[in-house]
C-alpha cells in the first residue's frame, strides 16, 4: 500500500520582463526574460514549423511572437521592455504583434550591432 503523492510545482509570477527579439536575415528568435535575464519563454520561426526562406518572413515573426507570449502569460507577465536587434525585415511586424498582445510596453530599445569595419560582407548575388 505504498502510494506516491505527486506535488505540483508552483510557477513563479513575474509581472515585469524584457522581450529580446533577434531578427536576422534567415530567422526570428524571441526570448522573454525577467529583469535579471533568466529565460521565461522563447520561440523561433524555425521551431514553429517554418522552414527555409519562409522563416525570414514577417508572418513567421508574428506567429513566433504569439507563441512565445502565450507561454510568458502563463507566468503572469504584464509589463515588458522591448530590446530588438538584427537587420531582418521582420522587425516591424514583430513589434506590431507584441502591441496586439495587450502588454504594457515601457520602453523600446534597438540593440543592433553596428560594425566599425569588421568582417568582410558576403559577395553580391548574381541571379
Curated annotation (Swiss-Prot):
- Identify the InterPro entries for this entry: Ribosomal_uS11, Ribosomal_uS11_bac-type, Ribosomal_uS11_CS, Ribosomal_uS11_sf
What's the family?
Belongs to the universal ribosomal protein uS11 family.
Which Gene3D superfamilies is this protein grouped with? Ribosomal protein S11
How it assembles, according to the record, is:
Part of the 30S ribosomal subunit. Interacts with proteins S7 and S18. Binds to IF-3.
List the source organism.
Answer: Rickettsia africae (strain ESF-5)
This chain belongs to the protein called Small ribosomal subunit protein uS11
A GO term for molecular function: structural constituent of ribosome
The UniProt keywords, alphabetically, are: Ribonucleoprotein, Ribosomal protein, RNA-binding, rRNA-binding
Q: Which PROSITE patterns match?
A: RIBOSOMAL_S11
Q: Can you tell me which residues the record assigns to a coiled coil?
A: none
Q: Which GO terms describe its cellular component?
A: ribonucleoprotein complex; ribosome
Q: What does this protein do?
A: Located on the platform of the 30S subunit, it bridges several disparate RNA helices of the 16S rRNA. Forms part of the Shine-Dalgarno cleft in the 70S ribosome.
Q: Name one Pfam family in it.
A: Ribosomal_S11
Tell me a GO biological process for this protein: translation
Tell me where on the tree of life, at the top rank, the source sits: Bacteria
Amino acid at each position: 500500500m505504498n502510494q506516491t503523492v505527486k506535488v505540483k510545482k508552483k510557477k513563479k509570477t513575474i509581472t515585469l520582463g524584457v522581450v529580446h527579439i533577434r531578427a536576422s536575415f534567415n530567422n526570428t528568435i524571441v526570448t522573454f526574460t525577467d529583469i535579471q535575464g533568466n529565460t521565461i519563454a522563447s520561440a523561433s520561426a524555425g521551431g514553429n514549423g517554418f522552414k527555409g526562406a519562409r522563416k525570414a518572413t514577417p508572418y513567421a515573426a508574428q506567429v513566433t511572437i504569439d507563441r512565445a507570449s502565450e507561454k510568458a502569460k502563463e507566468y503572469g507577465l504584464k509589463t515588458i521592455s522591448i530590446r530588438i536587434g538584427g537587420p531582418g525585415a521582420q522587425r516591424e511586424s514583430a513589434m506590431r504583434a507584441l502591441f496586439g498582445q495587450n502588454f504594457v510596453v515601457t520602453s523600446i530599445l534597438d540593440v543592433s550591432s553596428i560594425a566599425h569595419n569588421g568582417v568582410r560582407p558576403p559577395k553580391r548575388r548574381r541571379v
